[in-house]
Amino acid sequence: MPKFMDVHHGMHGVTPEALQAAHQADLDIQGEEGVDFQRAWGDPESGMVWCISEAPSKEAVQRIHERAGHPATEVYPVPVEV
């Protein structure tokens, strides 16, 4: 299944607990779109959050994030991994 990296902006001051809660909201509904969110990272200072997932499409990734309450600003395919 294709991999995707998505980026969220505007999450200034994000804490580990807030990031875990947002990630869990994705995990709770990811199966409805066939998405597998694997990991999330955050930078409280810049307000950026990044997520890596496997999904049938970038649109599926975006739909889950939107439904979970934190739409991604950008979603990129990750065609090469080492």
Name these PLM-found stretches.
Residues 70-82:
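Conserved short beta-strand edge segments in small beta-sheet-based binding/regulatory domains
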Residues 1-32, 36-38, 43-47, 58, ...:
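Short S/T/G/P-rich N-terminal loop/turn motif that feeds into the first structured element of a domain
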